[in-house]
Amino acid sequence: MIFACVNTKGGVGKTTTAVHLAVMLARQGKTLLIDGDPQASAASWAAWRRETQYDPSPTTTCLAGKAILAEGKQLATGFEHVVVDAGGRDSVGLRSALLLAQ
């Protein structure tokens, strides 16, 4: 399943929701967290989680714009679950995350 945490407003909890959902899903199977926000807060969080050796830690990548859809589709084939954290503005990246979600 592919989830997208999106909203056109910043500060509403998208990243918090995305990272907690990704960890919960990682306990159930192989999970990818796509950070599609230029602030890269989800990727920063994931790096901290790996450094502190908390388990499970979802695989994380940063993608932007149309790459969220194009590369996201290819990457998703290797995972049971995918969570996309999109930036808080109406953008190509946000719309690509919505198109990728199931």
Regions found by a protein language model. Name each.
Residues 1-101:
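P-loop NTP-binding core
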